[in-house]
Every structure is written in structure tokens, then in C-alpha cells.
Amino acid sequence: MAPQEDPEDHVAPAAQRVRAGTLLLANTDLLEPTFRRSVIYIVEHNDGGTLGVVLNRPSETAVHNVLPQWAKLAAKPKTMFIGGPVKRDAALCLATLRVGADPGGVSGLRHVAGRIVMVDLDADPDLIAPLVEGVRIFAGYSGWTIGQLEGEIERDDWIVLSALPSDVLVPPRADLWGRTLRRQPWPLSLLATHPIDVSRN
């Protein structure tokens, strides 16, 4: 049976400000290797600062080699992703809930935004499995202190956009950076044509 569709998977409203569930896309002038063409999903944004994970930086480390109990639920390519430069020795897990799934009463899940939840890696994967389309596990995260991210946005380092529930589990070959820009209105969508190798421009 085909999976039930969610209208949110096709249309993301424009993001007016940074909040949990929004995306930060590296602008074309942000050439620092850690964040170049990165797409960051914001997990927390509050008075304590901002925390997010890079969605498009897969590592070569298989989930099975680090957290074997979660390997079955891990979305393809079933590798750990580099969430950012902070605490690379710590793991953080996000999941996309199935359409209509009710996580109420299930320990180990914390709502982030829409159908995205944070998963406690000490939870029982067998209890989580019926509720989610898959999980993505990140080594480390990206963090900003109070006001730091706002300054970077004012400097045009980042573009703030709304996320689709499917963005969290997109495989690396899909070019999430370009795909996210292409679904934006003109002229923002034109940035998707920016060459990966700027020396070719």
C-alpha cells in the first residue's frame, strides 16, 4: 500500500523568522567548508541560543557500527550524518512521523515542529518504529549563542526558509540545497543555478 501523503510534503510556506522547524540555507557567498551549500534544520531556538543540524553532510560511518539497534530504522544511506562542528562525539536523532501517527504516550519522542520529532537514542526502537517513516542520526550539531545567528543572517550568510517534513530524510544524492531553492518563488529560486565550483562561473 502506498504511504499516505501529507499536503505539507509539497508546499512549504515562507519562513518569516528563525524558529524550531525552519531551515537555514547557506548563501552562495558563504564559502567556509563546514557550511558551504549546507542546509541546517533548526531544532531549538530560544533565549538560550540556537541549535540545528546539517541535513546534507553524510559521513562514511554506518549507523550499524555505532548504534546497531537503530540501523533498521535509519533512512538511506544508513550512515551517520555530520550535524555540525559542536560535540562531534555526541549523537542526536531526528525522525519524520508517519502521516496520522499519534506519538502521545510514547516515551522517547519530543516534538520539534510539524511531523518532525527528536528521538531519545536510549528509547526502544521497536516502540518507535510503527510511528515513523525513518530516523536520521547526527554526530554533533551546529550552535549559536544569543544574537549570534541573527548577526549572521543580517550579514546575508544564511537564508531562512520553511522546511518540508520530507527534508530531514532526503538522501544526499538529491542535492537538498538546490532542491530547496528551486521550490522557492522567483528570484530566490535562481540561486539554485549557482555553480558548485565558483571557478567555473
Swiss-Prot record:
InterPro entries according to UniProt: AlgH-like (IPR003774)
Signal peptide residue numbers: none
A UniProt-annotated Pfam family: DUF179
Transmembrane residue ranges: none
Gene3D superfamilies assigned to the protein according to its UniProt record, in alphabetical order: VC0467-like
Domain of life from the UniProt record: Bacteria
GO cellular component: cytosol
Similarity comment: Belongs to the UPF0301 (AlgH) family.
NCBIfam families, per the entry: PRK00228.2-1 (NF001269), PRK00228.2-4 (NF001272)
Name of the molecule in the record: UPF0301 protein MMAR_0053
